[in-house]
Amino acid sequence: MKYDFTEIEKKWQAYWEQHQTFKATEEPNKPKYYVLDMFPYPSGSGLHVGHLEGYTASDITARYKRLKGFSVLHPMGWDAFGLPAEQYAIKTGTHPRLTTETNVANFKSTLQRMGFSYDWSREINTTDPGYVKWTQWIFLKLYEKGLAYVDDVPVNWCEELKVVLANEEVDEKVNDGYTVVRRPLRQWMLKITAYAERLLTDLDEVDWPESVKEMQRNWIGKSVGAELDFYLAGTDEKFRIFTTRPDTVFGATYMVLSPEHPLLDKITTDEHKSAVAAYREEAERKSDLERTGLQKEKTGVFTGSYALNPATGKEIPIWTSDFVLMGYGTGAIMSVPAHDERDWEFAKKFGIPIVEVIKSPHSVQEAVFAGKDSVCTNSENAEISINGLAYEEAFEKITDWFEKKGLGQRKVNYKLRDWLFSRQRYWGEPIPIKHYEDGAERAETELPLNLPEVSAYQPSGTGESPLANIAEWLYGEDEHGKFRRETNTMPQWAGSCWYYLRFIDPDNPNEAVSPEKEKYWMNVDLYIGGAEHAVLHLLYARFWHKVLYDVGVVSTKEPFRKLFNQGMILGEDNEKMSKSRGNVITADSVMSGYGADAVRLYEMFLGPLEQVKPWSTNGIEGISRFLGKVWRLVYPNEADGTVQVTDDAPSETVLRRMHKTIKKVGEDTETLKFNTAISEMMIYVNELQKEKCRSRTAIENLLLMLSPFAPHICEELWQALGHEESITFAKFPEYDATLAKDDVVTIAVQVNGKLRGTFDAAAGLSKDDMIAEAMKVESVIKFTEGKEIVKQIAVPNKLVNLVVK
C-alpha cells in the first residue's frame, strides 16, 4: 500500500472535525495545559512557511501534553481590526468586514490543512459584536477607575495614513517610509504609568526570555534620582529638573529645556526669540525617537537667559534642545558635560565649559568619563563637601543637603508614557462614551456599541474619524439630555489585550469570562510568538490583565507564565520573506508537493526553534523519505497493502534504543528542542530497519512519539494496527531508566581537581575499575608519575579525581 499523503491528510482532518477530537473541557481530576499562539492579523497575502513555525511548535506541545494526560486548551482566532483592511476599503470601497471575512477563510483553510489541533469551537474574531461588547466593557472598567482620560497632547501624526501613532509604533512606520510629525490633538489616553512599578517587578514572576524582559524593563525605564530646584539668575523664580546623578551637580555648566517647556517663552530674550521659535517648529516635526537617538547630531539654541547652579552659585546658560522631552522628568535637565556623553558632545559643539567633578582616568576635555566607579572631586562649597565620596554615599549626602534647604527631593521616574489609545479611523471598536451639551461625559449603557455603515472610509484629516459624518449614529438624546458620541475608535491592540481570556469562555453572553473557567485555565502555560511584540502587545496585555486582576475578573497577576519566541525562517536566499523580494514560499504550495506532515517535521528539523534559519525546498525531500521509511515499517510491500507487524518482543538492541528514544524525545519535546527529538526518532527508525524489526511494541511506541510532529501518518498507521480510537487519546510511552542508560559513557579524569584527560568505558563500571582505567590514561600519567596518590574519588559514569602530592 502506497503512502498517499493527500488522501490520508484529508481523511484525518475530516475525522478530527467530525469527532471534535480536540475539544477542550474543564476536567478537575486532570492537570490542565493552556498553549496559545499569538493570534494572527488575517492579511490578504495569506500564510507562508515562516508563519507556520510557531503554530507548528505550539501544536506539537498541545498534542504531546494530551498524550501525557493533560486537559489541553489550544485555541485559534483572529486579530481582525487593523489598518490594512481599512486602507483597502479606502482604495476599493469594499467594506473592511468583507475583506476580513475572505482573509480569515483563507488563513483558516491553511491552518486546517496543516492538521493543527485547535479547538475550533472556541474560534473568536475581535470584530464580532459579541467580542467587541466585552472589549468595550473592559474599556469602561478602565474609565471607571480613572485610567482612561482625554487630553490634548502632542501626538505622532502620520500624514499619509491620517492617523495618530502610539510611541511604540513610530519606528516601524518611519522605517516603512511614512512621515511622522508631532502635533497637538485631543486624544484618549490610558494611564499605564499607574502600573509602571508592578509591570516592572512582576517580570520576576514569569518564565520569559531574558532579552524580552530586558526590553520591557528598558521601555518602562525606571530611574532613581532627585528633583532639584535652580533659580533663574537675577530673580526669585525657580524651576525644577530631574537627574539620576545629583552627585555631579557641582559640574553642571549649562541647563537644557525641552522646546515644549512652558517656561521657554518667558525666559527667552528678545534677540533669541526668532531662533527659539524656529527651532521649536522644527522639533515639532520630529518623533521622540528621532529626537533622542544617541547617534543624532546635537542641536540646540541659546535662550539668552541664565540659571544659578545651587551648589556653586555660578550663573550657567539655559539652552533649548530637542533631545529633552517634556514627557520625561520635568522637561528640564542640568547638563554635566564631563560625565555624560550627550552633554559632552553638546558642550564641545557649542563651546560650553567642561568641569571634572568625578575623578577621571583621563582628561575630560578630551573624552567623557561617565562611570560611577570613582570618587567625587571639585565638589564642595561653604556648606557641604562630597569630595572623596563614592557614588552612593555622595548621592545620599548631596540629596539630603538639597532636601534640608527645601530645594529638592528624592524622586523615582519612569520613561514609560501613558498609552495613546484613540485612533481617527473607522475600522476599530467605537469608544463607548457620550458627550452631553452640558459638558458631562457618560458611558454607553447598551453594549456593544456597533460601527454604523458608512459610504466613505477616508479619515477626515481633522482629527476625527469617518464616524463624525454619520449624523444618525453620532447624535442622540436620552434622559440626561442631548449627546454626541465619541468619534475616536480603539487601536488594533485593544482586542489583542485580552483575547486569551475569551478563548476560555467564548460564548458567554453575561461575562467576559466566568470565574470558574478562568480559575481552571489561567494562566497561559505556554505562549509562542515573535519577539517583535515585546514592548507592544505583551506590555499592553500585561497592563490590562493587572487592571482586570484589580477589579476581580482574573485570579492571576500575570497572563502568560512561559513565553517562547521562535526564530524567523528566511527565504532560500537568506533574506526575510517578502513579496517585494519575490522569495515568499507559500504554505499551501509546499503542502501540495510534500504533505502537511512533511512540512511540520521540516519546519522543526531546520534547527533550534529560537534561531533564525533559511528555508530549503531541497531539504524537505529528506523528511519526505523519512516518512516513507516510517510507512514501510507497517506496510513493507507497497504492492499487497498488508500490515506486516508481529507480536514478538523487540530484540535487546532495539529495546535499548527504544527506551533511549522515548527518554530523549520526551525530554526534548518538554523543552521545545524539537530538532533533536526528530533526529533521535530518525536514528530509531534506522535501527528498526537495520534490525528488520516488525515488533508491534517497537512500532507503536514510535507512532506515539512521532504523532505530535506528524499526526496524519501516525493516525493512519495507528488505525492500521487495529486501534479504533484516535491516537490523540493514547498515552505517551514511558521509558525504563535501566534500559535507557547509555551503553558507553565518557569519564573525565582530574588530578588535584584539574581536568587532565578522559576515557570511554561501559556504563556502570565499578569505582575500582574506573580508577584503574584512569591510571592508564597517557595524559594523566605525567601528572601522577613519581607522586604519592593520597586520595582517589570516583563518581560513577562521570569522573575520577586523583589527589596527589
Curated annotation (Swiss-Prot):
- Short sequence motif named 'KMSKS' region, residue ranges: 576-580
| Protein encoded by which gene | leuS
GO annotation, cellular component aspect: cytosol
**Family assignment?**
Belongs to the class-I aminoacyl-tRNA synthetase family.
Q: Looking at the record's lineage, which domain of life comes first?
A: Bacteria
The subcellular localization recorded is: Cytoplasm
Entry protein name: Leucine--tRNA ligase
Where does the chain bind ATP?
A: K579
Kindly list the GO molecular function terms attached to this UniProt entry. aminoacyl-tRNA deacylase activity; ATP binding; leucine-tRNA ligase activity
- Motif 'HIGH' region at which residues? 40-51
**Catalytic reactions on record:** tRNA(Leu) + L-leucine + ATP = L-leucyl-tRNA(Leu) + AMP + diphosphate
Task: Show the Pfam families listed in the entry.
Answer: Anticodon_1, tRNA-synt_1, tRNA-synt_1_2, tRNA-synt_1g
**Could you say which EC number(s) this protein's record lists?**
6.1.1.4
List, alphabetically, the HAMAP family matched.
Leu_tRNA_synth_B
User: What broad class of enzyme is this?
Assistant: ligase
Keywords tagged on the record:
Aminoacyl-tRNA synthetase, ATP-binding, Cytoplasm, Ligase, Nucleotide-binding, Protein biosynthesis
Source organism of the structure: Chloroherpeton thalassium (strain ATCC 35110 / GB-78)
Its principal location? cytoplasm
Q: Which CDD domains match?
A: Anticodon_Ia_Leu_BEm (cd07958), LeuRS_core (cd00812)
NCBIfam families, alphabetized: leuS_bact
